[in-house]
A protein has these predicted regions:
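Alpha-helical multi-pass transmembrane bundles of energy-transducing inner-membrane proteins
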Residues: 27, 107-114, 118-166
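Short conserved micro-motifs on helix faces and helix-strand junctions that flank
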Residues: 10, 71-72, 124, 133
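Generic detector of intrinsically disordered, low-complexity, polar/charged segments
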Residues: 13-14, 33, 155, 165
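Transmembrane helix-loop-helix hairpins at membrane boundaries of multipass inner-membrane proteins
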Residues: 1-8, 15-110
Length: 166
């Protein structure tokens, strides 16, 4: 059961954010409703994981005997995931208004949501390989947020961000 508690908060926003990029929302209200529900569900799933998950590890993938993708809930991951799960919905509410005048909102909201899942992956990382993988994925998931206006200046900033982060 720990596997579900640890993977659902990560994969719900990952899949939801990527699929939502393909959806053409008929109105701003419907877009906000979709992302609001998705992010609040992810926060609820995260808090459920924090409260119900034991300290056992869950192995997602085994490459070799020593190299595995492992998720684990411990004290630090509870703190970090709890902060993310609490603050992300408030950030979303702020961004609804802050980003209202911008273009490329489908890209912004998709990657904003994906970033939530990847952040939780960093929180639940059970070993250094898993943390490194999710850290690099976080760099890639936030790159479109840095480049969001898609202006020449934003693209140059995105290249710098990618070079410094990788």
């Amino acid at each position: 059961m720990n596997g579900l508690y640890l993977t659902l908060p990560i994969f719900l926003p990952l899949v939801g954010g990527l699929v939502s990029y393909l959806i053409r929302f008929p109105s701003t209200r419907s877009r906000h409703l979709f992302y609001g529900v998705l992010i609040c569900l992810t926060s609820a799933a995260t808090w459920l994981s924090i409260l119900r998950c034991g300290s056992e590890s869950f192995q997602l993938l085994r490459f070799t005997e020593e190299l595995t993708l492992t998720l684990r809930m411990d004290g630090a991951s509870r703190l970090f995931a709890g902060l993310a799960a609490t603050l992300w919905p408030f950030t979303m509410l702020y961004a609804f208004d802050y980003m209202s005048h911008e273009k490329h909102l489908s890209m912004f909201w998709s990657f904003f949501t994906v970033s939530f899942g990847v952040t939780l992956g960093v929180a639940f990382a059970g070993n250094m390989m898993t943390m490194y993988l999710f850290y690099e994925l976080l760099t890639l998931a936030t790159l479109p947020l840095v480049m969001q206006p898609m202006s020449t200046t934003a693209r140059k900033a995105g290249v710098k961000y990618a070079v410094y982060s990788m």
